């Protein structure tokens, strides 16, 4: 086995569920894709392909949505995080409606799909976006910043007006199976006080205790409790990984985020792509380009 090659899934695998915001049934299929094709969403009901690109982002309210013409795909961040975290460069993500199924609210079901499918190496070198200069964007007390680094690191601080989610931080260096172990199982969350407002806006129609952590004034309403003591911050890390996947390739850089969300994450991606002086794109050509130990899913432990 070599590590410089691009990878795709080895066979078609599917799952079903409901859309978190639409409440509509949805079937998702991960299918092999050619080298250098990247991640592409396919609206099977419309026969339209929507590449996973930042310039196609059309909405960042409570989730990230991409669209090409009338073909929209919503809540893409969890499956994008799973594909990126598991080192998949090329994949057709087929869906039979306007939203990716939320499943259990985390990326773990998509990780399981990828493991079920297996992976296949391709005869093309992986491309990496290498951050050479710091890039930062702020919105009041919110921050998203990328700095040069020898791997891919995410350091997120979540801080909400609630005693259970105050100044909660999580930092992870994405190496080997770190995404699967430390990030993938963290679920999306919401506050009970916000549910009525979200549903009035046409959102969260498919939300339940089966696919989201719900927090009331004092406690967690889910009978099973939390999967991690800092699950909220871990899920924000998951979201950030999915959002940064819209750069179109793995990243070599360190992301620091404070109270950031989908909108600020995508603003950072746009700023990076708009400034060729802050980054460069490299392509691996052989195992000689890869460090001795296995590379991380979203970067390499040593500079290329």
UniProtKB/Swiss-Prot annotation:
Disulfide bond annotation, renumbered to this chain: none
Reactions accelerated catalytically: a UDP-3-O-[(3R)-3-hydroxyacyl]-N-acetyl-alpha-D-glucosamine + H2O = a UDP-3-O-[(3R)-3-hydroxyacyl]-alpha-D-glucosamine + acetate
Cofactor(s) this protein requires: Zn(2+)
GO CC, alphabetical: membrane
Source organism, top-level taxon: Bacteria
InterPro entries from the UniProt entry: Ribosomal_Su5_D2-typ_SF (IPR020568), UDP-acyl_GlcNac_deAcase (IPR004463), UDP-acyl_GlcNac_deAcase_C (IPR011334), UDP-acyl_N-AcGlcN_deAcase_N (IPR015870)
Pfam family membership, one: LpxC
Cleaved signal peptide residues: none
Class of enzymatic activity (EC top level): hydrolase
Pathway(s) annotated for this protein in UniProt: Glycolipid biosynthesis; lipid IV(A) biosynthesis; lipid IV(A) from (3R)-3-hydroxytetradecanoyl-[acyl-carrier-protein] and UDP-N-acetyl-alpha-D-glucosamine: step 2/6
EC number: 3.5.1.108
GO MF entries: metal ion binding; UDP-3-O-acyl-N-acetylglucosamine deacetylase activity
GO biological-process terms attached to the record: lipid A biosynthetic process
Residues bound to Zn(2+): 78, 235, 239
Keyword line: Hydrolase, Lipid A biosynthesis, Lipid biosynthesis, Lipid metabolism, Metal-binding, Zinc
Hydrolase found in the keyword field: yes
Active-site residues (renumbered): 262 (proton donor)
Function: Catalyzes the hydrolysis of UDP-3-O-myristoyl-N-acetylglucosamine to form UDP-3-O-myristoylglucosamine and acetate, the committed step in lipid A biosynthesis.
Entries under HAMAP family matching the protein: LpxC (MF_00388)
Family: Belongs to the LpxC family.
Name of the molecule in the record: UDP-3-O-acyl-N-acetylglucosamine deacetylase
Species of the source: Anaeromyxobacter sp. (strain Fw109-5)
Gene name linked to the record: lpxC
């Amino acid at each position: 086995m070599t590590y410089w090659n691009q990878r795709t899934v080895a066979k078609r695998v599917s799952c079903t569920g409901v859309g978190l915001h639409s409440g509509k049934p949805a079937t998702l299929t991960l299918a092999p894709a050619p080298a250098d094709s990247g991640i592409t969403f396919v609206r099977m009901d419309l026969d339209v392909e929507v590449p996973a690109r930042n310039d196609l982002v059309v909405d960042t309210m409570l989730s990230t949505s991409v669209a090409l013409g009338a073909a929209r795909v919503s809540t893409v961040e969890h499956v994008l995080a799973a594909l990126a975290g598991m080192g998949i460069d090329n994949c057709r993500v087929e869906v039979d409606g306007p939203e990716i199924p939320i499943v259990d609210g985390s990326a773990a079901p998509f990780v399981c799909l990828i493991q079920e499918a297996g992976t296949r190496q391709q005869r093309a070198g992986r491309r990496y976006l290498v951050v050479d200069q710091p890039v930062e964007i702020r919105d009041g007390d919110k921050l998203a910043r990328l700095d040069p680094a020898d791997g891919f690191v995410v350091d997120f601080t979540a801080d909400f007006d609630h005693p259970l989610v105050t100044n909660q931080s999580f930092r992870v260096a994405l190496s080997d199976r770190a995404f699967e172990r430390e990030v993938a199982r963290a679920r999306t969350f919401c506050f009970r006080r916000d549910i009525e407002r979200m549903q009035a806006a046409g959102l969260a129609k498919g939300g339940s205790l089966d696919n989201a952590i719900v927090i009331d004034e004092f406690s967690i309403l889910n009978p099973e409790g939390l999967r991690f003591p800092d699950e909220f911050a871990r899920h924000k890390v998951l979201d950030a990984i999915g959002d940064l996947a819209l750069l179109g390739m793995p990243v070599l850089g360190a992301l620091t985020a404070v109270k950031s969300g989908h909108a600020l994450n995508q603003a950072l991606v746009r700023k990076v792509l708009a400034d060729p002086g802050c980054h460069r794109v490299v392509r691996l050509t052989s195992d000689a380009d890869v460090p001795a130990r296995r590379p991380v899913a979203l970067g390499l432990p040593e500079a290329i």
